[in-house]
């Protein structure tokens, strides 16, 4: 199952908070979809299963963004025990690239000695016997390694940029930080740029 974010280019109808809350037919269609999602089993993350009200939040947000709510749901998580819904950086990247008032997509320039990072990981075995990978480099290898993310907003002539060092990426909950750190840093850069 692909977890890439599907977007639509719907220029004919804008769905926003007002239209969702004041258009009874639209609201009911979204509520029906949220009930379908809540009962769709493994097609949605565990934090949405059996919870149509939680699914409604995703369905409404996906409608505002012009995206598939099932794909959006796959890119969410609950922050600790707070009940706060978080969006994965890949989703934020898709939203920014499809909706931001920029002249084009966000660009990336990599700098530093990435050869000390990319492809260097160590395979480990969990207590349950499952294999996983972790970074095989040290914090010293991260020194001076980073990315410059930039894009020019419509109506402006100079790009807005964000410089993000690999060492600034403190939360690395995915094994993708070991296998594809450049991609992970790019997603984080877009999230912070936005």
PLM features per residue range, with description:
Residues 2-194:
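Glycine-rich anion-binding surface patch
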């Amino acid at each position: 199952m692909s977890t890439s974010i599907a977007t639509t280019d719907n220029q004919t109808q804008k769905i926003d908070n007002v239209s969702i809350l004041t258009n009874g037919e639209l609201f009911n269609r979204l509520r029906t979809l949220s009930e379908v999602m809540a009962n769709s089993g493994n097609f949605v993350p565990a934090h949405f299963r059996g919870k149509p009200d939680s699914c409604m939040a995703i369905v409404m947000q996906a409608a505002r963004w012009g995206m598939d709510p099932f794909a959006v749901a796959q890119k969410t998580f609950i922050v600790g025990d707070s009940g706060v819904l978080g969006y994965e950086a890949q989703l934020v990247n898709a939203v920014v690239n499809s909706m931001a008032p920029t002249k084009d997509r966000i660009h990336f320039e990599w700098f530093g000695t990435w050869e000390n990072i990319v492809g260097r990981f160590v395979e480990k075995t969990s207590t349950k016997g499952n294999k996983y990978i972790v970074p095989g480099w040290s914090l010293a290898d991260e020194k001076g390694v980073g990315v410059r993310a930039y894009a020019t907003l419509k109506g402006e002539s100079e790009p807005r940029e964000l410089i993000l060092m690999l060492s600034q990426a403190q939360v690395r909950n995915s094994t993708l930080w070991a296998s594809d750190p450049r991609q992970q840093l790019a997603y984080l850069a877009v999230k912070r740029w936005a």
